[in-house]
């Protein structure tokens, strides 16, 4: 079981770059690049490298290209990793179509299975304020597979994402500065995960604490992440602590040891993240490095 967990974590880190809650514009997910973007970005090409902790030698694992249109909206992602199945990873591509007002009306997903390509189309509808309120996902035979619904508060902030695919509901709560301070994820009526966010006086995220439901249906801390910034407000590092890992280590060693996963960041002159390096389990040797090549218009 421990080995399986390591494999899944490796896939998530490389494919989604330690994805957190994705950024949204008009109720739509923008990219798998999970940092604020500055400047007139044309493309982002990022590659994840595994690092031999003994020799320091790097091995490229996968590369993703994200292309933006002149309005700053993502129009193409290829390839990304489809995580529909935990035992097999399939490359796929996403294409985003926009109407003449610049709103995403169709997202096409093409998954490259070994024997054929499978196409899924998601059509979006908007309210009178051009906020996305519904998504309908169809297979290539035109069969409706699932729907998504989005609701907003009076300030236009996305507050609820509801999908009949697995009965999932995500609820967002904001502070007076429109920062997300609480994220709750439900399966049916059951709260399965929640994340509290804390910001500094400049509106920078400085702490995330995630709680998960245990076997007794009690919420317990699964991890806490602390973010550090430089004098110019640029993200430079983050540290993630997991009490669950601490308790496991205490059980097998009969001693209390704090486990900390650390990530460091490098930014370009625009303030965009161009590199992140991941150090697991109190290690001084990195295990993964993600390199972002950003081109500008």
Locations of the language-model features?
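Bacterial Sec-dependent N-terminal signal peptides
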Residues: 1-25
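Buried hydrophobic residues that stabilize the cores of well-folded domains
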Residues: 20-297
């Amino acid at each position: 079981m421990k080995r399986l967990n390591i494999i899944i974590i490796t896939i998530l880190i490389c494919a989604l770059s330690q994805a957190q809650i994705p950024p949204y514009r008009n109720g739509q997910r923008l990219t798998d690049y999970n940092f604020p973007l500055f400047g007139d970005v044309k493309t982002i090409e990022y590659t994840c490298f595994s690092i031999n902790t003994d020799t320091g030698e790097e091995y490229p694992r996968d590369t993703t290209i994200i292309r933006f249109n002149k309005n700053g909206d993502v129009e193409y992602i290829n390839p990304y990793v489809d995580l529909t199945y935990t035992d097999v990873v399939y490359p796929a591509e996403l294409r985003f179509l926009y109407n003449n007002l610049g709103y995403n009306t169709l997202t096409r997903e093409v998954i490259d299975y070994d024997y054929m390509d499978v196409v899924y189309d998601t059509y979006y509808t908007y309210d009178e304020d051009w906020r996305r309120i519904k998504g309908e996902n169809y297979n290539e035979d035109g069969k409706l597979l699932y729907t998504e619904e989005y609701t907003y508060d009076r300030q236009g902030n996305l507050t609820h994402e509801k999908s009949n695919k697995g009965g999932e509901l995500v609820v967002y709560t904001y502070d007076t500065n429109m920062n997300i301070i609480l994220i709750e994820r439900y399966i049916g009526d059951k709260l399965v995960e929640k994340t509290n966010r804390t910001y500094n006086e400049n509106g920078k995220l400085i702490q995330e604490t995630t709680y998960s439901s245990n076997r007794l249906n009690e919420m317990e801390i699964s991890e806490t992440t602390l973010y550090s910034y430089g004098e110019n407000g640029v993200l430079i590092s983050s540290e993630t602590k997991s009490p669950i890992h601490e308790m496991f280590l205490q059980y097998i060693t009969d001693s209390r040891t704090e486990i900390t996963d650390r990530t460091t960041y490098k930014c370009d002159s625009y303030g965009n993240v161009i590199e992140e390096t991941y150090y697991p389990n109190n290690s001084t040797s990195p295990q993964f490095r993600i390199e972002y090549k950003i081109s500008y218009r």
